[in-house]
């Protein structure tokens, strides 16, 4: 007697892979960067049945950097997808980079079937354990019913508080299983309460008074301003107070470098006059920075002549590298909005004149030669030809 064919799933049921992709759609995802493999094939097939655009990259490291760039450029959560084993481990450098740069990212990896996890199955790597220290959080999905909740939590964790990468590892059998999904509308994570601190009125009045009393104030602006979408608030502050600005590598773009008050980048690879200004300032307003060693050099010598006010959304950054006279845990956008309502119109002509002397004495310059094409010359020529409108991507080589 012929065996009866398996009954088709009930109409309301969905395959695990489709549930995951539908969860992405519900989070507003429009683009996924991925490279398919055996353990993630179900997910990629589900993508073809969705409205999400899949950008096929040549390598998993390339895909996660593409997702990171997308997140930085758009302000949205970047999403990438890879298979198990070597596919997952190829994401490691990108995850570490996103963690260091506080970039919101959700990385989804396929995994070997649940029944063979821990048995050295083909292309099995414990990617959750491998990435635990370089992600904001990670998940190993062990029930198909948990997929909608986990994806919603992953996006919430990646994009709130101090942003960062979240990894979701999905075994192949979970992708192939069926269930009736329940998509949550809200997120409730008892163990995760993202810091939404807002600077107190008293603290911001103290900052405003410090600015009023200062003779040589300086704003030290970092990537936290970009993450908080607070560039307009920073520019409003500078327009009102006329305080010079230095920027970290991660903070480039928060203030126009063509503005006379911009001292460009600070630190090892920054301008001489930006570093001189740090050393001579009597008040350093550190906004959304981490006092990175490439900026500070010897910590005991950094900004040792001035009072330091450090505002950051992550309390763990306060006093971690450099002890501040006034550390404030706050969303920088909120803090700047409050500060803009308290500061008075001011200017520091003597301080700016002193900085301009350094600027003239130590400009960014190079000597053109007929024998060689210097990198500086190539960049200068490209800038002139494109009138500054081109999007240029670079590595970090010398």
Regions found by a protein language model. Name each.
Residues 109-150, 251-354:
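Glycine-rich, acidic loop regions that bind phosphate or pyrophosphate groups
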Residues 17-21, 35-38, 43-45, 356-398:
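Active-site diphosphate/adenylate-binding microenvironment
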Residues 81-83, 106-111, 142, 169-171, ...:
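Short beta-strand segments
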Residues 41-114, 273-292:
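Thiamine diphosphate
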Residues 37-39, 112-113, 170-176, 223-225, ...:
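Glycine-rich beta-alpha junction loops
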Residues 2-6, 45-50, 108, 130-136, ...:
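Gly-rich Lys/Arg/Thr-decorated short loops/hinges at beta-loop-alpha junctions or inter-strand turns
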Residues 30-68, 199-200, 206-284, 384-398:
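Anionic-ligand anchoring segments at beta-strand to alpha-helix junctions in alpha/beta enzyme folds, i.e.
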Residues 125, 157-213, 352, 364:
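Conformationally flexible catalytic loops at phosphate/diphosphate-handling active centers
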